[in-house]
Amino acid sequence: MSKRDYYEVLGVGRDASEREIKKAYKRLAMKFHPDRNPGDKAAEASFKEVKEAYEILTDSDKKAAYDQFGHAGVDPNRGGGGFGGGADFGDVFGDVFGDIFGGGRRGGQRQAARGSDLRYNLELSLEEAVRGLTKELRIPTLATCDLCDGSGAKKGSSPTTCGTCHGQGQVQMRQGFFAVQQACPTCHGRGKIIKDPCGKCHGEGRVEKSKTLSVKIPAGVDTGDRIRLSGEGEAGEFGAPPGDLYVQVTVREHAIFVRDGNNLYCEVPISFSTAALGGEIEVPTLDGKVNLKIPSETQTGRMFRLRGKGVKSVRSHAVGDLLCKVVMETPVNLNDKQKELLREFDNTLTGSSKKHSPKAEGFFDGVKKFFQDLNS
């Protein structure tokens, strides 16, 4: 099946800036992320398609090749279209004009591939994310074979030059007027053949292995943050550089606090008497309890700010605040005496609601005026 246009995949125009491309990628990656769509094969395929498009269009060299030649310009396997034989447009025109003017571009052997990048999804509690910590991570990966040191050849032997391409990694085929170069079918473009493969890695130069890494998580990380560990991905082919490891952070929901950037939010219940008369209550923070003074006549929903009790920014020395929303609790399970006292108290307010409940009085005045206007 033919690939979709990379610009179409990201939903941007061909003149899109790198910033616009990154913005589109972030939105689509969040939409199709496997963690948000568990078991959804279509979403997983879309996520891979979006990631591939992003990697090509944010690499200046690959983007230039793609803009000029399309998918053929960035296909690592050099898969061609109507010209057949696996050639790309660079091969076709280079060889044609080389034959005409003498010399021309000659294909080289395929470079050993860099190791693949790995991703590790790390879930943290809010406390861990705010304070930072060191985590031991067990990572399944492909490691360089220690028996053959990554060569793929049996100890004491070494790869030999391919007899088909004579070490060039490519062979030339003529198709009418065109001279087409393609990867050597014998050595698959490497220019070398392993006649006596290593018994441990079977000629691959890499073996499956798990390794344990000690990773320092900085204080203040949040969901969506990514930590890059250079060179800790899969080993490269036959001595090529390794890939990187990306630790993707997710912070679990907290029972008390809600985080928004560097600020924390929580709801604190207060009694009717404390709201009316004022007082002092204990408020939880990530560093322990602190006292919060509640002024008299406090209404439910009022927000109090405790400066410096939020989260320290992972990118600066700034520290957020803790914002506490007080919620007045209605008394429950009252006995007869308590109910009678409340009735007596309510009777003392009769006829003076505007003085003691200005919001309620204003509300009912508004309702009364609404119906008067409706009937007039």
Curated annotation (Swiss-Prot):
Domain named J: residues: 5-70
UniProt cofactor note: Binds 2 Zn(2+) ions per monomer.
Cofactor section: Zn(2+)
Predominant localisation class: cytoplasm
InterPro entries hit by this protein: DnaJ, DnaJ_C, DnaJ_domain, DnaJ_domain_CS, HSP40/DnaJ_pept-bd, HSP_DnaJ_Cys-rich_dom, HSP_DnaJ_Cys-rich_dom_sf, J_dom_sf
Domain of life: Bacteria
Cysteine disulfide partners in this protein: none
Subcellular location: Cytoplasm
Keyword annotations from UniProtKB, A to Z: Chaperone, Cytoplasm, DNA replication, Metal-binding, Repeat, Stress response, Zinc, Zinc-finger
Oligomer and partners: Homodimer.
Family: Belongs to the DnaJ family.
NCBIfam families: DnaJ_bact, PRK10767.1
PANTHER family hit by this protein: CHAPERONE PROTEIN DNAJ, DNAJ HOMOLOG 1, MITOCHONDRIAL-RELATED
HAMAP family linked: DnaJ
The protein's name: Chaperone protein DnaJ
Record organism: Shewanella loihica (strain ATCC BAA-1088 / PV-4)
